[in-house]
Amino acid sequence: MTLKYTEDHEWLKIDGDTATTEGVVVTVGITHHAQDALGDVVFVDLPEVGALFAQKEVAGVVESVKAAADVYMPVGGEITEVNEALRADPALANSDPLGAGWFFKVKLSDASQLAALMDEIGYTKFSA
């Protein structure tokens, strides 16, 4: 498992081989930093399964007691699954942002887009 991060405070979990885009699916959520800045999450708007998005396109919204924020696609691709548990209990984004609080899964359209994302060390420096 490999984690990558965006400047918009989303994370991607990469399972498997990214040498080919065929069948590569990544899980996407918001970072601990993002959920901490938002405060208590009260609503999430998730994309539809089967929807196609370009990299950096808005794919969802997360609302908290403090603010609303867009969730951007860290990579282009097709939504293969959304986290229905998160829709039912948005607080999972706060209590377990890197685990049970994931937002959606995406089948990559271009694995080369992963190269522009930050690793954990880079993201830690960026968000400090």
Q: How should each PLM-predicted stretch be described?
A:
Residues 70-74, 107:
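Histidine- and aromatic-rich ligand-binding microenvironments
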Residues 45, 68-71:
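Composition-driven detection of intrinsically disordered, low-complexity segments
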Residues 1-58, 91, 95-128:
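Acidic, low-complexity mobile loops and tails
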Residues 79-95:
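Short, charge-rich, low-complexity interaction segments located
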Residues 64-67, 84:
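Short, conserved catalytic or interaction motifs in soluble domains
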Residues 32, 66, 75:
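A short beta-strand motif that forms part of the nucleic acid-binding face
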